[in-house]
Amino acid sequence: MPVLACCVDAAAPPGYAFAGDISFPAPIAFTGVPPATADDTNNSNNHWSPSLSAALYNVDGWGGPYFAVNTAGNISVRPHGSDTVSHQEIDLLKIVKKASDPKSLGGLSLQLPLIARFPDVLKNRLESLQSAFDYAIQSGGYESHYQGVYPVKCNQDRFVVEDIVKFGSPFRFGLEAGSKPELLLAMSCLCKGNPDGLLICNGFKDAEYISLALVANKLALNTVIVVEQEEEVDLIVELSKKLCIKPVIGLRAKLRTKHSGHFGGIFRRRGKFGLTTARVLRVVKNLDLAGMLDCLQLLHFHIGSQIPSTALLADGVGEAAQIYCELVRLGANMRVIDIGGGLGIDYDGSKSCDSDISVEYGLEEYAAAVVHAVQCVCDRSVKHPVICSESGRAIVSHHSVLIFEAVGTSSTNGGGAPPALSAHYLAEELSEDYGYLSELAFRGDYETCLVYTEEMKERCVEQFKQGTVCMEQLAAVEGLCELVRKAVGAAESVRRYHVNLSIFTSVPDAWGIEQVFPIIPIHRLDEKPSVRGILSDLTCDSDGKIDKFINGESSLPLHEMEGGRTYYLGMFLGGAYEEALGGVHNLFGGPSVVRVSQSDGPHSFAVTRAVPGPSCGDVLRVMQHQPELMFETLKHRAQEYVSHDNAAALLAAGLARTFDRMPYLLSLSSFVADDVAAAVPAAQDLGEQWSY
């Protein structure tokens, strides 16, 4: 059926008016399917269900066992993972309401974007990791134990680190630091932890760093100074003798096993960290000459983050275990093998080893592969070492959700209702184009229809550049082309959803390394998504967008925005790195944060901590501005240019509120503009002109 005639008929479409005495060819009458109506949309939703949305967004794949779609069509958090019973689930939409509602309605008056942290999820991740290694050790007859450390670089938030130390204390969980401030916070937190928990000191080191690590040892913290560079050995020897503190030393080996993915770069032979075989031998010799070879007790290595397969993992661990055995043979007092990070997260739920955003294994398979690889090598001649891992990404990724609003949409084509055409010659040209398009539609040549409309638009653009076509005419032609695209059944253009967020601040890896995170609506999942969209942030930067999604998609199924109803989206599995890496591009600061725990009662939760995001004044201070002085300058300016005292005071009050609010967009209902509105007529009554 020539569907063009269904949308283009004898009367000009709304928004079109052709000037001149032009007679258009009568459209060919065709019967066909009528356009969709509201009833059709309702029928579509009647056949939709939350379970279909769960399948569409693959929630069970990437979110299990911590996230699910509930019967109300909202995302629920399952705080205890697989052990969560149905009445313990927490509805994310209820958390948003609690956080954002005004205090007069029992809310917390927090502005979005919002990070919701779930310490119960954090606890479950720690326990699950420990259980996986415990099972692998017991079932395989391994003759030592596992005790992990959390690398604080993944998320240095005070309460995250303190929770990990608290939850990990029963199984001697420790911390890893890679800089002096990280070491200070690790030392402080571990004072309340298990005394057997390891404090691993990685990273580049100067005399102050090494002295601080030695002091940690003196404070009865189980501290290991890991040699990353050969030159560090001399400093460790010199300072330990000067301070009369015997150190525990580890060394980081640079392996030959290859991890070819994006996250394997630091592991390659030209990588940033680690000692080659020759340098390892020199370190051993130097420690022996200093009479401190017995201090060498730990071997550390790192294959790379997001290790995709257990085969690659076992290969690297096996190589490192052989180095460990050689160090024992050379006389070192070896006790611990630290396998570093690499325990991956399945960001898209595909369980694939061919992607940087997925892994083919779970916690149990990972632990079994590590234990078996170490055991196979050490069974030859060496006592089984304590196994340590630095699995930060796997521990904290699931524990937080970033929630943000969509504040508007636009077509990526710039389509819209066109204005009237007013030039006689253009109408004649359109008449010829219309006749040709009708002929193509009659023949069913819809592909040529699309090609011709694009050519027509290009001709009009060239005429516009030459000044022979005005902007209204150009817009009208673009609108006609969009109508034709829809009429012939072309795929609807992708919408741009404008979100109240800074990608650079809250999802920096999406911009920096094109990392893909699962992003989905957190509500309305009982409705069928009717459009596809990309996300565009508030920054004045073309890179401030997300147009890559899980499963290789370049757009995301979304719902039509409804007037007066906020549309909330959530980014999941972003609990590692994103907060620490985020900047203040365009002076947008971080999100508000709530800490949410499951409490007694069906679907009950408690917000145990709530922190508003940085205000405009806060982010200005980051760049060395002085908001208090800025406010005084503007206040004096208002007094100078607004002669009415009350009006000047009201304007100053409005400025003060802006300094105190977050930089993100406010809904009109949240914006208290009464004082400013009162100031404007007062000034106008005095005959003053407002300039902008």
UniProtKB/Swiss-Prot annotation:
Keywords: Decarboxylase, Lyase, Magnesium, Putrescine biosynthesis, Pyridoxal phosphate, Spermidine biosynthesis. It catalyses: L-arginine + H(+) = agmatine + CO2. It is an enzyme of class 4 (lyase). The modification N6-(pyridoxal phosphate)lysine is found at residue 153. Gene3D superfamilies: 1.20.58.930, Alanine racemase (3.20.20.10), Lyase, Ornithine Decarboxylase, Chain A, domain 1 (2.40.37.10). Pfam families: Orn_Arg_deC_N (PF02784). Substrate binds at residues 337-347. Belongs to the Orn/Lys/Arg decarboxylase class-II family. SpeA subfamily. This is Arginine decarboxylase. It comes from Glycine max. The lineage of its organism: Eukaryota, Viridiplantae, Streptophyta, Embryophyta, Tracheophyta.
